[in-house]
Amino acid sequence: MTSRYIPQLSFSFYRHRTIRADFSGGQITSDAGLLPLRAFDQRHGLTRSLAERVCDDRDDTRVSHPGLSLFRQRLYQIIAGYEDANDADRLRHDPAFQILADQPLGAPLGSQPTLSRWENSPAPRDLLKLQDALLDWFVKICGEQVRKRGEILLDVDSTDDPTYGQQQLSFFNAGYNQHMYHPLLIFERHTGCLLAARLRRGTAASNARIIPLLLRIVPRLQREFPKARIKLRADAGFALPLLYEFCEFFGIQYVIGIAANSRLQEKAQRLQRRLARRYRRTGHPQRSFSSFRYRAYSWSHQRRICYKAEHTESGTNVRFLVTNLKGRSRSVFAFYNDRGECENRIEEFKNGFAADRLSCHRFRANAFRLLLHSFAYNLVNLFRLQLPSSLRSAQIETLRIQLFKIGARIRETARCIRIHLASGWPFQDLFQAASLCNSS
């Protein structure tokens, strides 16, 4: 039998002794910290619920990689920072990911071609079922919190997803000055959960498809939480009369930005002149809030407009909101400005979970990819909600460093699989706490 040659590397910087390194350490992984997350997933049946929603037409007798295994392989590799399907070829022999995917040790996971075929397989009805799973996870895990709080706060926004090839429905968007997709996202503010993620063509308006998406969410939320108030916030890209009417019909309290026009500016002129006089007298920046009733030509009735006027050395600036909230205009603006947290969630979704890595050719495959990254985000977000308070708002990069990325030697015996974690790991207490929270 021919023995495999294992090259040795030498390092001479250590003055006490010569250092030699090789790759003969055996079954060692750098991602053993994902085990508590996998236990959390198992306890609530999260990834299993995804596989049950996708029709798999393959012959069971000839399938080496079941749909559930592929879901788990893809999600946990995204969470670990291996977002590209090409990474699968390098990780398919990693013992930790074999365990996470519930595959026998030594059985290779799906290759990059296998994952690519799988990502192109879901039908439109499968994508709709998966879209509903985002809401199902929220109801299942966060339902008790919502009932105690009595409020659901929806933050609606769109984001850019640059494209670099001949992807279907990738178009040039003049607003972003690039070829792109234009995903639509809905987050729940209090929990940070992503409730909806819809991929759209690059030229889609910010508010395109918002009503159909809300129709899949709002009635379900009202059935599950009949006593909870639902509120909605969005920027001026969603200043759509149909959206106002939708919110009013379903009893949703909303605050939505609205672009200035001559009629709105005329209504705010008196306050602007007053601030300008005060600024000339004091030399200090001035700010004030007020509101009035207004009806645009396309509106069926008057609505409340809150506005903020500022006067500085740069001149006067006025911003307008349309709302059905009561209370002081200053409080309405404070409530609206808090939607900046949604921008932080989107940044983590795109940068931490690489949700903008939609490089398949077919639009439907990229829509499926967006959902995969959405589930990876939600799995981690739901998991961190039950971590110690110091880590409940931790970004994914922090969780990778302090929890997920830990070296371990994996050894299979006749009775069990033993995972020997690094003795010098500085975050052992966190790992133990997360494991105890999710022990069966």
Regions found by a protein language model. Give the residues of each.
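Short amphipathic alpha-helical "interface-anchor" segments enriched in bulky aromatics
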Residues: 40, 329-372, 376-383
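C-terminal, non-catalytic "cap/extension" segments appended to globular domains
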Residues: 361, 366, 373, 380-440
